[in-house]
Amino acid sequence: MANTTPFAAFHLDVAGASAEEQVARALARDGMVTFDAIRSRGELLQLCNRLGTIMKHRDADEAGLTRIAKRSDILPAEGYQAFTSSHLTLHTDGSSTPEPATLVVLWCVRPATEGGMSLFVDGKQIYQVLAKEYPQVLETLSTPNSALFAGSEPPVYGSVFSTHADGSIFVRFRYDGLGYYAAPVCSVLPLFLELLERYTLSFPLQKQQGYILQNGRWLHGRTAFRGEREMYRVLICTDPATSLGISVHLGFQPGL
């Protein structure tokens, strides 16, 4: 069962003069920021350009904005569930790309009439629980080349948890028809999924509310919904030459 967490718990004023410094500190500490100071797509793009480089995406427009809404022109298919009203399972954005976006930004234009709750799980918390209580499961989920993430050409071979050269941990996961796992991983997936459910946070996004998510740390999804829910998503790669990019990159320090 998802634990409802107030939107205010991660809230920051992203329009302030020192917003970048505050966002950098919050993302380095918590991996998530929520905001309600953006009033237009133009302001959203301005915010995102301050955070890093906007990444192009298959479904994005020329500016890098992806409109996330129920679309009748797209037939149901793996990798396109975001454009339906169905439940969207917890996942890493760009799991099938070698270097996924550092940040995912989602901004609400129109909330759902019913449902459409945003779902989140802190991969750092899951990692720490596994390290303390189920170290053998963590070892299995960290085995190199124990997972295949399809959806791009070529697909990516990796693992649910991987370690970067600097010791930081990156979570890469999807649980749909484009995620394939070796037999040892499949044997521990029920426990992993149980932990995801146990530690899921949820809250609705109202009009002109949004969030910034550290993509290598937090998994995200949504519940099924009714109504004309409309969101805009932007994928961002942080620049290590900036103050934000120095402290916010793809992954987390497991012991901090």
Summary of predicted features, one role per range:
Residues M1-T66:
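N-terminal non-catalytic cap/leader segment that marks the start of a structured domain
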Residues A2-V14, V23, A63-L256:
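Active-site environment of non-heme Fe oxygenases that use a 2-His-1-carboxylate facial triad
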